[in-house]
Amino acid sequence: MKNIYNMYDFFESLTDIEDPRQFKKVKYPINEVIGMTLIASLGNANEWTEIEVFCKLHETLLKKYFKLENGIPSHDTFQRVMGMVNPNIIQQIQATWNEYISQNDGEGIKTMAKA
């Protein structure tokens, strides 16, 4: 992953992930699905339905980081897309995310909380 200097860089770096889906069938960009899942996890959303609900409740915040041209994905879409991504890639993303959050004294979280 690229060097991460802020939350925008982090979420932008997710666009480099290979999307295993058929291009013509993609409604939600992979960086948005993964990014929203990570943000929702900070809000204690652990189930796919909780992730969907969290994202719908915080759509204004999420629009700071993502285009959301097609709105918020359903819980089924979150589950399906995340299930298609290589688990090693997900583990690497999670490690980078955790490192960013811890190295910056939670500044990313504070920034999101102000939204």
Residue ranges and their predicted role:
Residues 1-114:
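Dynamic "connector" segments at or just before major functional cores
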